[in-house]
């Protein structure tokens, strides 16, 4: 995270909600980009999750906000993973959705939202993400996903993009498609 340098820097957000918890006092960010990768529906072969993990490591992100798991995750459908070693329960890992902050090698502040796609309260979750993004001064949001596509492994994978903005699409050279599919959270 960067030191404050101008009018677009954002200090400690004051938004509070019982659906999330701030893990830091003052995340100082300058016009960050928000990258969203929620595992679940749209992540063929775990490609998008691997991309988000790589980005998080390269930008040396650390958690700044954690969502309340009981509010958004159905643990009957997404059970915690119990680690057993020689019959001893050594750990219990719960799914969690968190927002991490870091900086790219070019000095750009990056926010990475990771975890499982919410099982419930999608409208509330979307509003919270939108409000938090505004509070933190986010200038752009990018969602990672990977659709399954029948293509030989000998071919270069195709990248595609979608956006609610025709202005954004005018500035990218990725393939565009027309299709009706079940939507993911991101």
Predicted feature descriptions by range:
Residues 2-115:
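N-terminal short beta-loop-beta anion/metal-coordinating cradle
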Residues 38-42, 112-122, 172-182:
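Flexible, glycine/proline-enriched loop segments at strand-loop-helix junctions
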Residues 44, 119-123, 148-154:
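Short, well-ordered, mixed-charge alpha-helical segments that flank or form enzyme active sites
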Residues 139:
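Short acidic/polar active-site loop segments enriched in Thr and Asp
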Residues 150-186:
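Catalytic cores of processing enzymes, dominated by hydrolases/peptidases
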